[in-house]
């Protein structure tokens, strides 16, 4: 099972070979045909549940070396509790996850060990290439009430505001505001239309953005201080066909993105394949 593409007079095979398990799930894929530069990704699954339990990446340019060895662990309810990636040289990116009785994520962190012991979870004991520790608090009906973000050197807590609960409440699960304390303090507010679409939100760099939606609840424009930040156009099926943002206009057609820089007249493109 291969995937081949062409551009002009040249063609290339992107997926050289695909191997499947007896259940029809993909077990391995071989990429590329250039001598000595192909790579293979292998996926491991639990035979009873078919849950993904691991992934290995091997490249021909590094024979005998596993470029990435990822393992995935679950709790009895099927929630992911650990994703551990071991990289060349022994560097480990270990992400751990804990859940409450409602099976909502409450803790996500990267310890400086290969295990996920909640008893050793500490801001000073974070590790990996991008160390972090995030905690979420929820109320009895499942709304997130606060989030605490930590790195080895910083910490901040964000609390969330909602409309009132009850049958007469409008959009009771829509976040209307946030208040952040700690190393990155700040406040933010949000509004929504009757369909629940966000109509106002904080803008990057300060100020607010207004979001405009059509009758099909598709985002058509983002504005700031009366000026357009981005515009989107859709076809009759609801698929986005055009996006204008800044000096770039992007056309989406037949699995391709064709972008024109209206200032420099430079055209770039991305092509996407399904396999």
Region spans (language model):
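Short secondary-structure transition motifs
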Residues: 131-178, 206, 211-275
